[in-house]
């Protein structure tokens, strides 16, 4: 039960911080731009599972994971720039 609470806290904090950062709420299927609904919750749940497996989880670390996931999703295009298709 505690693990589910940690997942929920991480998920909610990622969505709230993503909304505060000004990310779009809806996502476009033809775009690689991140939004609050994709990939932010999936990054948060994945990081929570990874940290929970490697290290122990508590509420503070779940909140920190949620904040990190939303900031990572916000700046993904700057961290991993796209490929130019210019052949010239």
From Swiss-Prot:
Reported function: One of the integral membrane subunits of multisubunit membrane-bound [NiFe]-hydrogenase eha. Eha is predicted to form large electron transfer complex and might catalyze energy-driven reduction of low-potential redox carriers.
Domain of life of the native organism: Archaea
Ranges annotated as spanning the membrane: 1-21, 27-47, 49-69
Protein encoded by which gene: ehaA
Annotated Gene Ontology cellular component terms: plasma membrane
Main location: membrane
Pfam families (UniProt xref): NiFe_hyd_3_EhaA
Protein name (database record): Probable [NiFe]-hydrogenase-type-3 Eha complex membrane subunit A
Family under the similarity heading: Belongs to the EhaA family.
Annotated source species: Methanococcus maripaludis (strain DSM 14266 / JCM 13030 / NBRC 101832 / S2 / LL)
The entry's keywords: Cell membrane, Membrane, Transmembrane, Transmembrane helix
Localization terms from the record: Cell membrane
Membrane topology type: Multi-pass membrane protein
Subunit text: Putative multisubunit membrane-bound [NiFe]-hydrogenase eha is composed of at least 20 subunits.
